[in-house]
A protein has these predicted regions:
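Basic, helix-initiating cap at the start of DNA-binding domains
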Residues: 1-18, 22-30, 47-50
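Short hydrophobic/aromatic patch on the recognition helix
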Residues: 32-42
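Residue-level detection of the helix-turn-helix DNA-binding "recognition helix"
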Residues: 43-44, 54
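Hydrophobic alpha-helical connector segments
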Residues: 51, 62-91
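All-alpha amphipathic helical-bundle segments outside canonical DNA-binding/catalytic cores
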Residues: 76, 109, 127-143, 162-167
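Short secondary-structure transition hinges
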Residues: 86-119
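C-terminal peripheral helix-coil segments that are non-catalytic and often amphipathic
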Residues: 116, 120-128, 153-181
Length: 181
């Protein structure tokens, strides 16, 4: 992916997370390109939407890979994933909104693959006896997406300082799944 494509995708996340029905002209303007340039890479809205979903999957895999490389402890790995993901709250909000309004069934296996990687970290922490045994993995994934949506709302509204959002996301997530002593 070249710089122009990446700029267009970043602009799509930014613009469409605020107004899902915004015209592609707004995306092109935010990316600093003409609409013709946008269409050179993404022939229509559907192709652009598909590319944003795939980019979010790719980026989330990258976040998990970085956490697993950076830390040996599964709890620290999970913390790194939650905190980094929370800083991308606008992208997760965009994805959830897109999935509500469009048919993205062809991408579900890719999203499920990401979820499985996150749940792998949860299971590693669970195996250490730290996760509430009554907390099913399906609930934990819903909690994860809820935290991402809350992060986006806080970032979007400016109601919480952006630097605080990742730590608050981790506090919320960890207090929701870990056993209290």
């Amino acid at each position: 992916m070249n710089k122009t494509q990446r700029n267009i995708l970043n602009a799509a996340f930014e613009v469409l997370s605020q107004d899902f029905s915004a015209p592609l002209d707004k995306v092109a303007d935010a990316a600093g390109v003409t609409r013709a340039t946008l269409h050179r890479y993404y022939k229509n809205r559907e192709v652009l939407m598909e590319a944003t979903g795939l980019e979010l999957v790719r980026h989330t895999h990258e976040i998990v890979d970085e956490a697993m490389t950076q830390y040996d402890n599964p709890r620290e790995q999970l913390k790194a994933v939650i905190m980094k993901s929370a800083s991308l709250g606008d992208r997760f909000h965009f994805l959830l909104h897109a999935m509500e309004h469009d048919n993205h069934e062809q991408h579900y296996p890719k999203f499920q693959e990401v979820e499985q990687r996150i749940l792998g970290l949860v299971d590693a922490v669970r195996n250490k006896g730290l996760v509430n045994p009554d907390m099913p993995n399906a609930w934990i994934i819903h909690l994860y997406y809820g935290i991402m949506t809350t992060s986006w709302s806080a970032l979007s509204e400016g109601s919480v300082a952006p630097k605080k959002v990742p730590e608050l996301a981790w506090q919320s997530f960890s207090s929701g799944i870990f056993l209290t002593k």
